[in-house]
Curated annotation (Swiss-Prot):
Record localization: Cytoplasm; Nucleus, Nucleolus; Nucleus, Nucleoplasm; Nucleus
Gene responsible for this protein: Dis3
Gene3D superfamilies xrefs: 2.40.50.690, 2.40.50.700, 5'-nuclease (3.40.50.1010), Nucleic acid-binding proteins (2.40.50.140)
GO cellular component: cytosol; exosome (RNase complex); nuclear exosome (RNase complex); nucleolus; nucleoplasm; nucleus
Entry's EC annotation: 3.1.13.-, 3.1.26.-
Residues found modified as N-acetylmethionine: 1
Disulphides: none
Designated name of the protein: Exosome complex exonuclease RRP44
Modified residues (Phosphoserine): 215
Transmembrane regions listed in the UniProt entry: none
Length: 958
């Protein structure tokens, strides 16, 4: 059956075109009920249960299926995801609305419908001839969709009665729309609100905690006192932004001060890049990462950023008065040049709320169901939730979602989502850091796994088309110990003309991950593999990452090869790229490869190849450094785990060998060669990576630190910086050069992916290369998969597709990759920090030598080389006499009583674990040497204050 819709549309050129849309209706779409003989199993995929069970509702004691409307899916997804909610019919009408309004919720509901244990069934009511309806004259789209949902619910009930007359099976409409519910009841459709239905499930009282209360009736504060200004409607905000009255930007809350935030303005005007927001009323219920509209205050009301550290310790609505008292502390007299553009939030353009991890702060009122939740992320305000399981949730990590923030409430309202486990447990804390850094880590869905090759897999004749057979070459891989996702392998051999052939062979992941399918979409969403201390979150399923794509030894593998002909001076004479098949002759660790190179007794083909590669790598590195490439340093920690408990039993810095540098040089060379090739072929659509030069002010701390040791660091170019660092040696202080390079690393900007057609600056500052990309790690970086596809098209080994040559879509991919890469780094650091805490928890009190990296007004920041660990030694203690402190920003130095501390001075510190705040345990450091009366803590004396409950956070003045 065919319906068509005809309408006229005005074109951009001013013309008029006639549009005809065809809409096909069918009579063979299954209802999803196994008992239905009429549909004859026409439904495919996950279906409803024959006899719905485990839904003992006091309102509906008979067997039933649920049919939620759009708003229930959008706002009560936490309820629907609970294991007790099964046998749900999701209409096509509802899915389309959810998809248009919230991509994250749409993804979650798709995951639920793909879970066969949940028995969710998607019914395509818009193409069923019995349930499709036309929009009536004068009816808006929302009312039409509500009617379509009621029509489908009514059809289901009548249909099930016809096919199973003796069955009591019914379909219940779940809607929070009062008018929709009234109309449904009038039409004879069983209908309840989500709250009514959930409260009727007496066997699952915990479900009530998951309810999102959208109207603020349930969470109104009894006093009713208005605290915040009303948010302006979106139409007024858009008018104001267009006229210039308001500015649009991203709200960034402060970690250090809950009464302060900044708004990063969306636009090109540099002078309006950042607006300061100060004070609880000016923040006006904005939450970190929300897109907001701000009004710039008159210049007379501009303020300076506060140096005061303030944590929100309030418990009730009266705390607003305390907040206002605290705001007065922020307003201190400062010079005119310290003032910053200041504004106030007038409206919310887009909420970017997510589920938050944290802990419950149980109410002091006995039997109270309302409690405050304290998020782990200090940038998020406390959230008021209603729960009946407060006692069971004490001391545990939980997830809470925000529902809304009424004007008369000091805190937003939310609901309990999930109990993650006990604070301090490894599994719990790992889950928290993954969730808090937005690292996708759910198991791969069946839809994704369906695109994997079937096992057993082998290379076919079809696979060999457009490929070179390089299995005869002596190829080997060199990686860290325990590496299973081997991306790259190398070879070097002498040619008959006396030159050398060098090959970098990279796993051909793009052969297995084809554009646009579910596997490709999931890989693009994840963006990168995340390496934690004890866990790896793969970007692609394990079958690919550790098996079919991994270039393991003695198995045939598909590769993408970059092959150079070089002379013995490492000068490139020819470069070619080819899809290939290789058979690695050895999977070596860096230590094993180094041993082969150094051993005079070993002269086999693999060792000869490694020696050739190593010699060329040294020449390549020398050439890069002469051009101005930077050799920086950062302390990397490696844990040794107990084989049974998996707790860290040793902590040491990572050891680097010549072979680390050897592999790095050829990966850099391959990336540069590929970048040139794809940019030649796709000048507007190449995915590249750039590293911006830091602004001169970034180097101030490095220049001052070097000056304190009578050394001069020049920073006008990367070459002058590299040369200065090379000359900065001290025979009496061999670690000085490493410290300078660590400081130089802190001065750098973040490298980012970008589309060549959207930017003119390609330069990579750190590598001193005019162009660069990522080609060598496609198992763990999605950027490399895109680069592989571009290169394959460039050499005629594969065909293109529309998205590959769409610079706007490529730019969006780059934004996601940059975000995922940054979040992965933060998650890795959080994992190291947690395992460091575990290590020192078991070690007790430890004293070690350290070097000062920074001096502050009331503290020194030190680095402990043995552990690669950084920490802060404070010199002001609460409830203790304050020492005489004199800070000099120019040198920089800090005088305490009679002792002066400079950057890079050697000290001895005591390291302990501060467990006074369960949610934010941290490593504390105290000075042991040099001796300062009233400051030092003898190395053999435990600092009980550090582990006593109720310890207050000390303020670090910058």
């Amino acid at each position: 059956m065919l319906r068509s819709k005809t309408f006229l549309k005005k074109t951009r050129a001013g013309g008029v075109v006639k549009i005809v849309r065809e809409h096909y209706l069918r009579d063979d779409i299954g209802c999803g009920a196994p008992a239905c003989s009429a549909c004859g199993g026409a439904h495919a995929g996950p279906a409803l249960e024959l006899q719905p069970r485990d839904q003992a509702s006091s309102l509906c004691p008979w067997p039933h299926y649920l049919l939620p409307d759009t708003n229930v899916l959008l706002h009560q997804i936490d309820v629907l995801e609970h294991p007790a909610i099964r046998n749900v019919i999701v209409l096509q009408t509802v899915m389309q609305e959810v998809r248009n309004r919230s991509a994250p919720i749409y993804k979650r509901i798709r995951d639920v419908t793909n879970n066969q244990e949940k028995h969710f069934y998607t019914f395509t009511n818009e193409h069923h001839k019995e349930t499709y309806i036309e929009q009536e004259q004068g009816e808006n789209a929302n009312d039409r969709n509500d009617r379509a949902i009621r029509v489908a619910a009514k059809w289901y009930n009548e249909h099930l009665k016809r096919v199973a007359a003796d069955s009591q099976l019914q379909v219940i409409l779940i809607t929070n729309d009062r008018k929709n519910k009234e109309k449904a009841v009038q039409e004879g459709i069983p209908a309840f609100t989500c709250e009514e239905y959930v409260k009727s499930l007496t066997a699952n009282p915990e479900l009530i905690d998951r309810l999102a209360y959208l109207s603020d009736e349930m969470n109104e504060i009894e006093s009713g006192k208005i605290i915040f200004s009303e948010h302006l409607p979106l139409s007024k905000l858009q008018q104001g932004i267009k006229s210039g009255s308001y500015l649009q930007g991203t709200f960034r809350a402060s970690r250090e001060n809950y009464l302060e935030a900044t708004v990063w303005i969306h636009g090109d005007k540099e002078e309006e890049k950042e607006i300061l927001i100060q004070g609880i009323k000016h923040l006006n219920r904005a939450v970190h990462e929300d897109i907001v509209a701000v009004e710039l205050l008159p210049r007379s009301q501009w303020v300076a950023p506060s140096s005061v550290v303030l944590d929100d310790e309030g418990q009730n609505e009266d705390d607003v008065e305390k907040d206002e008292e605290r705001e007065l502390l922020l307003k201190t007299a400062v010079s005119e040049k310290m003032l910053r553009p200041t504004g106030r939030v007038v409206g919310i353009i887009k909420r970017n709320w997510r589920p938050y991890c944290g802990m419950l702060s149980k109410s002091d009122i006995k039997e109270s169901r309302r409690h405050l939740f304290t998020p782990a992320d200090k940038r998020i305000p406390r959230i008021r939730i209603e729960t009946r399981q407060a006692s069971a949730l004490e001391g545990r990590r939980i997830i809470v979602a925000i529902d809304g923030w009424p004007r008369n409430s000091r805190y937003p309202n939310g609901h309990f989502v999930k109990n993650l486990g006990d604070v301090g447990e490894k599994e719990t804390e790992t889950e928290v850091l993954l969730l808090e850094h937005d690292v996708p880590h759910q198991p791969f869905s069946q839809a994704v796994l369906s695109f994997l090759p079937r096992m057993p897999w082998s290379i076919t004749e079809e696979d060999m088309k457009n490929r070179e057979d390089l299995r005869h070459l002596c190829v080997c891989s060199v990686d860290p110990p325990g590496c299973t996702d081997i991306d790259d392998a190398l070879h070097c051999r002498e040619l008959s003309n006396g030159n050398l052939e060098v090959g970098v062979h990279i796993a051909d992941v793009s052969h297995f991950i084809r554009p646009g399918n579910a596997l490709d979409q999931e890989s693009a969403r994840r963006g990168t593999t995340v390496y934690l201390c004890e866990k790896r979150i793969d970007m692609v399923p394990e079958l690919l990452s550790s098996n079919l794509c991994s270039l393991r030894s003695n198995v045939d593998r598909l590769a993408f090869s970059c092959i150079w002909e070089m002379n013995h001076n490492a000068e490139i004479l020819k470069t070619r790229f080819t899809k290939s098949v290789i058979n690695s002759k050895a999977s070596l660790t860096y230590a094993e490869a180094q041993m082969r190179i150094d051993s005079a007794a070993m002269n086999d083909d693999i060792t000869t190849s490694l020696r050739g590669l190593n010699q060329l790598a040294k020449i390549l590195k020398k050439g890069r450094i002469e051009k101005g490439a930077l050799t920086l340093s950062s302390p990397e920690i490696r844990f040794h785990m107990d084989s049974e408990t998996h707790d860290p039993i040793d902590l040491q810095t990572k050891e680097l060998r010549e072979t680390n540098s050897m592999v790095e040089e050829f990966m850099l060379l391959a990336n540069i060669s590929v970048a040139k090739k794809i940019h030649e072929e796709f000048s507007e659509h190449a995915l590249l990576r750039k590293h911006p030069a830091p602004p001169p002010s970034n180097y101030d701390i490095l220049v001052k630190a070097a000056k304190s040791k009578n050394l001069q660091i020049k920073t006008d170019t990367a070459k002058s910086l590299a040369d200065s660092l090379d000359r900065a040696e001290s025979p009496d202080f061999p670690y000085l050069n490493t410290l300078l390079r660590i400081l130089a690393t802190r001065c750098m900007m973040q490298a980012v992916y970008f589309c060549s057609g959207m930017d003119n600056d390609f330069h990579h500052y750190g590598l001193a290369s005019p162009i660069y990309t990522h080609f060598t790690s496609p198992i763990r970086r999605y950027a490399d998969i895109i680069v592989h596809r571009l290169l394959a098209v460039a050499i005629g080994a594969d065909c293109t597709y529309p998205e590959l040559t769409d610079k706007h879509k490529l730019s969006d991919i780059c934004k996601n990759l940059n975000f995922r890469h940054k979040m992965a780094q933060y998650a890795q650091r959080a994992s190291v920090a947690f395992h460091t805490q575990l290590f020192f928890k078991s070690k007790g009190i430890v004293s070690e030598e350290a070097y000062i990296l920074f001096v502050r007004k009331n503290a020194i920041v030190v680095l402990i080389p043995k552990y690669g660990l950084e920490g802060t030694v404070f010199f002001e203690e609460k409830d203790k006499p304050k020492p005489r402190l004199a800070y000099d920003d120019e040198i920089p130095s800090l005088r305490i009583e009679g002792t002066v501390f400079h950057v890079f001075d050697k000290v001895k510190v005591k390291i302990t674990l501060d467990s006074s705040n369960l949610q934010h345990q941290k490593i504390r450091m105290a000075l042991v040497e040099p001796q300062i009366p009233g400051i030092n803590i003898p190395p053999n004396v435990a600092d009980k204050a550090l582990t006593a409950p109720g310890g207050k956070k000390r303020k670090l003045e910058k």
